[in-house]
Regions:
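Short, structured beta-strand/loop micro-motifs enriched in basic residues and often containing a Trp
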Residues: 30-40, 80-87, 181-189, 283
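Intrinsically disordered, low-complexity linker/loop segments enriched in Gly/Pro
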Residues: 107-200
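N-terminal, Lys/Arg-enriched amphipathic/low-complexity engagement segments
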Residues: 12-78
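Short, Lys/Arg- and Gly-enriched loop/turn segments at beta-strand edges
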Residues: 62-73, 108-121, 212-222, 311-313
Length: 331
């Protein structure tokens, strides 16, 4: 743990490994073999690790690498539902249902040939068009693909526009107990949350539903606005470095996130306000369970000091993250 604050994180205080790094594992594209398009308990783990171990994962982009040119047709190239390929699952020794998987994101690094970033318009997909879930008579928007040079200096949208390079993990989570949930969908297990806070320096906390936890990861972005409005971020192949620990007997309903300055709870649902309600309800419960607030006081404080972050407004369920600064967590 290089950042000083990590020594005081929940992961360091309560994790089996106490924040100490263990063995380092490499999960290359070759070692991964077949990708997964659902989160579930039925796939054999590609890797089994111990609490505290570090895993370096090579991920494919959300398109499976098939869109290589601005002349490509997404409709012709993409094969639904085989989108958003996931690496894993990674099993963690000693993890049982009712535990928590703590995942610290060390790095998300762009890999592959330039232009490494891809975004596009996919007909009948996005936040301002008719979709299968929101049926409209309007004709689909025309397809369009944009390829971008991506490096630490920025995302070169055009000769005049350079976006900040803010890499993060779009899709990450654990296995449900018996369900198989599409990698395109976010839910209580995590999944396709598209939340820009899931970035280097953050620690995610997932409720475990099955033995081993079974962590999946993929779909990294180089940049994305709140809501991922058109349905597609600046998609990229990436090398992701994760340190994974276990907190025994810490059970809760939805994913949580910790940074140096704030705590966040994540909810996914339709309509959008229900995702916000889930996120805020879970934050009230966390403040009550671990920080000495009664629920009414927490509810009232969040009305003044809470913040809400829109992850996506395009997926089968929408994602919101509710947060509060740590400096206010004194009851």
């Amino acid at each position: 743990m290089n950042d000083p604050w990590l020594k005081s994180s929940i992961m360091a205080k309560r994790g089996v490994a106490k924040g100490e790094a263990g063995r380092r594992h490499e999960l290359s594209i070759t070692a991964q073999g077949d990708f997964h398009y659902v989160y579930g308990p039925y796939a054999k783990p590609v890797l089994t690790i111990n609490p505290g171990d570090i895993v370096v994962v090579e991920t494919e982009d959300a398109f499976g690498g098939v869109i290589t040119s601005e002349q490509d047709s997404p409709t012709a190239k993409l094969q639904f539902p085989f989108l958003n390929p996931q690496c894993g699952p990674v099993a963690i020794s000693g993890v049982e249902k009712g535990d928590c998987l703590a995942v610290q994101i060390h790095a998300v690094e762009t890999r592959g040939e330039q232009p490494a970033g891809t975004t596009c318009i996919i007909p009948e997909f996005g936040g301002l068009v008719g979709t299968a879930s929101t049926a409209m008579l309007n004709p689909p928007l025309p397809e369009r693909v944009r390829k971008m040079h991506v490096d630490k200096n920025g995302v070169r949208w055009s000769d005049k526009i350079v976006l900040p390079y803010q890499p993060f993990i779009g899709t990450i989570g654990v296995s449900p107990e018996i369900e198989a949930i599409s990698s395109l969908q976010p839910d209580y297990h995590g999944g396709n949350m598209d939340l820009p806070d899931v970035a280097p320096g953050a620690i995610l906390y997932f409720p475990v539903h099955t033995k081993g936890g079974l962590l999946y990861v993929g779909d990294c972005h180089a940049a994305q606005g709140d809501g991922e409005l058109s349905g597609v971020a600046v998609e990229q192949r990436a090398t992701v470095t994760l340190q994974i620990d276990v907190i025994k007997n810490w059970s809760f309903a939805w994913p949580r996130l910790e940074t140096e300055n704030f705590l966040m709870t994540i909810g996914s649902a339709r309509p959008l306000e229900d995702a916000a309600r889930i996120a805020y309800r879970e934050l009230v419960r966390w403040m009550s369970a671990d920080y000495g607030f009664d629920e009414i006081d927490a509810y009232m404080l969040l009305s003044q000091a809470g913040r809400i972050r829109l992850g996506n407004m395009v997926d089968p369920k929408y994602t919101m993250g509710a947060s509060i600064l740590k400096k206010y967590l004194v009851s």
